[in-house]
Amino acid sequence: MKKIAIYCINYHSYDSLKDFLDSIEVASKKAEQVVKISVFIADNSIPSEEIDFKSQHYSLEVYPTGRNLGYFGAAEYVMSRVSPADFDYAIISNVDVLLTENTFVELSKIPHDSTYGWIAPSLYSQTYHFDWNPQATKRYCIIKLRIMRFLFKHPLLLRLKQIVLHKYRHFDTYPSGNIYAGHGSFIILTKAFFNKCGIIHYPVFLYFEEMYLAEECLKHQLKVVYLPQIHVLDIGGTSTGKIPSKIYCKYNYEGINYIISNYY
């Protein structure tokens, strides 16, 4: 039986959290013969509300952080208290996603491979009707990253770029296989990742978490693999969709600057 931990991060999104936990209940029940699920909630809400959810098919622990630590900051906060290395898989997730009935069943079927560091599932957007994964199939070149950093320093130019790209964007579909990075809303990390990389330590409040994980996998010769037979639904925008544009650019600038400084 495979042990799976879910580290989910909540910030004043209790309705979405309940829906997320309900979906875990359904998926856990379907896979109760093959997986054991433990859910750990990092609650960044200030003030936090009582989370009174009773499950018959997984264990649940709540960790109020007492302040908003951001996405990976909150995940690290809980991981420092409950080691992800004790599990076969550790999932880091937003609460604005929903598991499908067979999410854990399909994950349990994946053969053990010590070279896997990160598994990216199909993350289907109910808003845009496409799969967010893979987020990137190849590593970004330094020139592209520097251009992106420049744009985040100049929000008006960034907005113009977004308008142009939105007009001409198209969405490709991809077969399963090795990729550079998956999407950050639902991240499946393996025991091998934590054995080689340790618990996550990304000292940026928000954004570019995916590149941090991708670079850690590259550094430690671990694969990032896209496996679309594992299905997750993206509801989208519960917390990050509320961030003002100037703050959005500030966080992105800090994130991309960290990636360039530490990995390029």
Model regions and ranges:
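Conserved donor NDP-sugar-binding/catalytic core segment of glycosyltransferases
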Residues: 98-135
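Short beta-strand-to-loop acidic/aromatic patch adjacent to the donor-nucleotide binding site
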Residues: 87-98
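Short, well-formed alpha-helical segments that are part of the catalytic scaffolds
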Residues: 13-29
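Glycine-rich, basic loop-to-helix element that forms the pyrophosphate-binding segment
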Residues: 65-82
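A short, conserved alpha-helix in the catalytic core of glycosyltransferases
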Residues: 180-231
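Acidic donor-binding segment of Leloir-type glycosyltransferases
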Residues: 24-64, 82
